[in-house]
């Protein structure tokens, strides 16, 4: 009987022999040797088990004797016999692999609950994960020194160590090196494609290919079409306008200052073989993408700046939203008077934070003639208004129609210098002057187109309370055909005007219409009409010559406190209005680039 004991950190193999091997070696040499594996709890915590290996020839009683002896020494030990048959004379020596496997072997699950010695016989050529099979030759194991190097996380080396079957020379010391770890796939889901680690792209830390770099240049307005441009975008054909500059940019990207077009051209020719790029024959510095990329940014040469009219159509659907503001938030606009006497600059404070909008202010052409407020100002085709586009912060105000006002166009049709914004008219006149409020949702940067400094003159703002305006009636003479009145009906924001309004000859009239760009299904624009009686209009004509006329949206609350009416008031000559009004003076609004 030969006993081999390997401790947990052991590198020596002790083989005490009692001569039993020599007595029975001639009869049972070709028979089947067996290996008894007994996991024994180790006193050292670094390695899990110590192993006792016994090589014997008699299969009858020796297993039981050893098991009983081991059971006395350790009460919680479990005994396993793993036996294999040697197949032929060419059986290999697996002593080192068996010793390594024994150090890592745990007790079989079928034997964990049993404390009695159990003998398990494993038939030949059957391999189960519960047992370790090792064929040990008695003539080889006698003088073998086993050195075991183990790691708990590393797999066992299953390759056999070939030995000559008829060699009876003493074997020298063998060393088992650590097997290199196998590369674990980043995604272990069974897919062989995902397990392949991708090759590092374009050197150290750079993840942009040359063809991707050229595609980025084609989508950059700073380089396209200055250095590179599309010749046929739908076919993916582009041209290097400045090949030297493109190669310098590529060298700067790759951190290679000596990059030139010849070096970059070799990389481009590499893409010919890959099927990414192709050289257009007959044209110099012209290449083509074989597969045109999608979702690229198109840079046009003659792309002009987006005009406000184009932006107005895009943002038209966003302009109809309700905004609840206080009465102090007013939309003010006035005609720009050149050379006015009351042009002292003041800053007008804003009540709330405004929204960037565009205000169109149309000023009349001056012919030098002064007219009184009671005279009729006919519309002349030659008097083309001058429009100044000013970008400034204006508050958003709700009108009586419930629409959002973001741009105001004020046009004066009379040609007199310093003449009132609203003039008198007679029933026989073709049309009356109107002030139009347009809903033009336009967003522009805060700068004027021509860079002019636009200064609005101080204006007198007339506020007509809702309770007084509702009681105001339009008086008509008995010889006229009809009459009209202003009524505030329905919802608090509804203002209705009854037409036609017939008035006497020479009476100043203020008429305001509010057309707007509205979606289908909305209420049509309503017209607010009011009567201005001006008995002293002639005497006050020169005094009010330089007063700037103002358009204002006023939100008033009724006496009962539950109704709020928004009015649009245009004031011509404040002293000529006979209605019960209150007058206050506002500061000027200064807009500059």
UniProtKB/Swiss-Prot annotation:
The modification Phosphothreonine is found at residues 182, 376, 523. The modification Phosphoserine is found at residues 107, 185, 191, 363, 372, 432. Keywords: Activator, DNA-binding, Isopeptide bond, Methylation, Nucleus, Phosphoprotein, Transcription, Transcription regulation, Ubl conjugation. Residues 1-34, 146-199, 362-383 are annotated as: Disordered. Residues 171-181 have a biased composition (Basic residues). It comes from the Eukaryota. There is a cross-link at residue 538 (Glycyl lysine isopeptide (Lys-Gly) (interchain with G-Cter in SUMO2)). Expressed in all tissues examined. Highest levels in thymocytes and bone marrow. The modification Omega-N-methylarginine is found at residue 496. One of its GO terms (cellular component) is nuclear body. SMART domains: ETS. Signal peptide: none annotated. Residues 208-290 bind DNA. GO terms for molecular function: DNA-binding transcription factor activity, RNA polymerase II-specific; sequence-specific double-stranded DNA binding. Residues 182-191 have a biased composition (Polar residues). The keyword Transcription applies. The keyword Transcription regulation applies. It is found in: Nucleus. Residues 370-383 have a biased composition (Low complexity). GO terms for biological process: positive regulation of DNA-templated transcription; regulation of transcription by RNA polymerase II. Interacts with LIM domains of LMO2. Interacts via its N-terminal region with RUNX1. Belongs to the ETS family. Probably transcriptionally activates the LYN and BLK promoters and acts synergistically with RUNX1 to transactivate the BLK promoter. This is ETS-related transcription factor Elf-2. It comes from Mus musculus (Mouse). The lineage of its organism: Eukaryota, Metazoa, Chordata, Craniata, Vertebrata. The gene is Elf2.
